[in-house]
Amino acid sequence: MAPSWWGRSGGGGVGNGGGTPVVVKMENPNWSISEVEAAEVAPGSPAGAGKAGRGKNARQITWVLLLKAHRAAGRLTGAASAALAVASAARRRVASGRTDADAAPGESTALRARSYGCIRVSLVLSLLLLAVEVAAYLQGWHLEEVASLLAVDGLFAASYAGWMRLRLDYLAPPLQFLTNACVALFMVQSIDRLVLCLGCFWIRFKGIKPVPQAAAAGKPDVEAGAGDYPMVLVQMPMCNEREVYQQSIGAVCNLDWPKSNFLVQVLDDSDDATTSALIKEEVEKWQREGVRIIYRHRVIRDGYKAGNLKSAMNCSYVKDYEFVVIFDADFQPQADFLKRTVPHFKGKDDVGLVQARWSFVNKDENLLTRLQNVNLCFHFEVEQQVNGAFLNFFGFNGTAGVWRIKALEDSGGWMERTTVEDMDIAVRAHLKGWKFVFLNDVECQCELPESYEAYRKQQHRWHSGPMQLFRLCFVDIIKSKIGFWKKFNLIFLFFLLRKLILPFYSFTLFCVILPMTMFVPEAELPAWVVCYIPATMSILNILPAPKSFPFIVPYLLFENTMSVTKFNAMISGLFQLGSAYEWVVTKKSGRSSEGDLVGLVEKHSKQQRVGSAPNLDALTKEESNPKKDSKKKKHNRIYRKELALSFLLLTAAARSLLSAQGIHFYFLLFQGVSFLVVGLDLIGEQVE
């Protein structure tokens, strides 16, 4: 028989007696108390009935509370297990780490050692100062004036008084001057960012977008009007990019354009014989399908990508083509790409370049790709679109763009003098008076670097090259015939503010000056510079990618962390150091952009394999390579500069506690943790 407290009868509960009935829903896994209701004790009931009922109810409540406690303990255990798993994974990744990450093929060992040594000396000095400040804080001397400290007996008190006088008279004034200068640069750059965002808002509000005078895309039958389509040359430079060549070649060969009016050049600079054989076989397969496609492999591989493109443009048949389209090896254009870009040249003889924006197939792969997506969305949505709409000039992105061949030739063609040949040709074309068009609604999908090592090398090239180019073309800009405001935009905004000042103040202000002001509190860095303005700028940066809003704090911290790499790259490019000439092909993973596109490529591949004999040597090598690759182990790289800066910032955070600077403390703490995560290579994928 069920106990009396199990349910409630119509007679008013437990034998119509007193007590506090408790209904427990047993089917509820939460074991929650669903009803606790006091009932009046019926007249004439035994005196102990109420107490007995309350005793039983108390026991039931105890059991429910115990079950809740058990569940809470289970949650804590799960959280602890997850934390241990993360710590264990971090330990394994760190244990397999390599400390050669800071090495660059062209960088001198002495220069690299000096850079790391300066950071290490700063760290040791900050630790010593922290120990001194803690001891002085315990003595209460941080509240005393220098004169009162001199009256205190003891060597330590006199030494600390001398340190305070040194700070006040000699260290604080120049540090405050440098702080004010960096804050001024920070404000100028923030105003520039705000103006760009206002320009983007105006473009959206007014619906401003480039409109072609005549759209070839309106014709339903491609072959019917082939004579109305201009001749287009498609170039695909690649180098040892085995993971992506097949899908990118397939995407280009399926472009919706009369086959007689476009030619594909696969410009293979691979030094791996197996990769070259596979690419050549893929080209031959599409040739048998009727596509006009040519395979080119240079014997003398000089000049990197610029040399490859320059060699291809020297072919005799190039004179028969009016436009040239460039796709890097990981880019997968939509079938209507040419129909949406080439018409913008018609009737506009002064247009030299039409640039499409990038989209990314792996933007949600990990935290690193998400943060890159925020940066590049702002770059295309705001910077490129605004500059294209109002100035008719922006930096060519190196791929997913259509050039008028006449504009290339008029600008001097491709040059190998820097590692940013795309920006080089864009600046020279702008100086010749050519106009650029940016199409924000035409996207070409590609990959983002998934490992920090690959991303770091890419960013080094992207930030050292512009400084090389600025040195080389500064005189040409001054002597050019373009207007004063175009010269001002090119020199001050395009090069100095966005390529030099931005990485300079980011590193100097947040990684050098801010920690120093903690140990020299007489020099002040306002809280609005540390927190409020950067937060506002981060919100503006993340607006073009609203789905990434939850990552706004990691984005802000990661951008400051990357300032070390960007600052080093800027210095190497400005002073022509060895690492400024380093060119490393960004590692690809071979992710597909569209399922139907891949299916189409696979369909053609299957048909071709049935009807033709494969290259047995290439296939044999291809089958043997996975076995070799399976033996490769992924490992982490240890970045010593980032680790040293992490400990420096954490030390400064501890010092800020003594000054009761809350905002500075939290910023330094989280920024130090961010440097630690990056220094241990715990962001992004591991490298093989």
Swiss-Prot record:
This is Probable xyloglucan glycosyltransferase 7. It comes from Oryza sativa subsp. japonica (Rice). GO terms for biological process: cell wall organization. It is found in: Golgi apparatus membrane. Belongs to the glycosyltransferase 2 family. Plant cellulose synthase-like C subfamily. It is a multi-pass membrane protein. One of its GO terms (cellular component) is Golgi apparatus. It comes from the Eukaryota. Its EC number is 2.4.1.-. The active site is at D269, D422. Keywords: Cell wall biogenesis/degradation, Glycosyltransferase, Golgi apparatus, Membrane, Transferase, Transmembrane, Transmembrane helix. Signal peptide: none annotated. GO terms for molecular function: glycosyltransferase activity.
